[in-house]
Amino acid sequence: VQVHELWSLDKESMAEVGPVHGLIFLFRWRGEKDDRATVTPGPGVFFASQMIPNACATQAILSVLMNCPSISLGEEMTAFKAFTKDFPPDVKGLAISNSDLLRRVHNSFARAEPTVSEERRASKEEDEVYHFISYVPVDGK
C-alpha cells in the first residue's frame, strides 16, 4: 500500500495510481461551531475521534487502512483493530493516543513544529490551520 498525491479525480488520474482504498483530503479548518447532529458510524466501520493534536494525517491514513478489508494490517494492527472494534469513537481515539506502536510510527514521520513566539501564538488571525479527512468505501459504496 502506498500514498499518492493527486491533483485531479478524473478517470485518467485515478487509473494511473492503481487500486484506490480511500481518499484523504486536506481542508482549511475554520473553527466554526458545527450544530449538525453527530453521525454514529455503521457496524464494521472504524471511526475514531481525534484526541491527539497535530495527528490528523496519521489518523486519516489509519482510517483508510482500518476500513479496507483487503489490506493486510500485520499482527499488531490486526490485534489493535480487534481490541477497539466495539469501542465508541472517543474511546477508539484514546486507544490510538495510548498506543506505543502508533506513537512511534507517527513520530518517525512527523515534522518538528518550529518554535513560535508568544506574540505570534497570540495572534491567531494570520495562522491558517489545515485538517486531513479520509473517505473510504463502505459495503462497496
Task: Identify the residue ranges that each predicted region occupies.
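Cysteine-dependent deubiquitinase/ubiquitin-like isopeptidase catalytic cores across multiple families
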Residues: 1-141
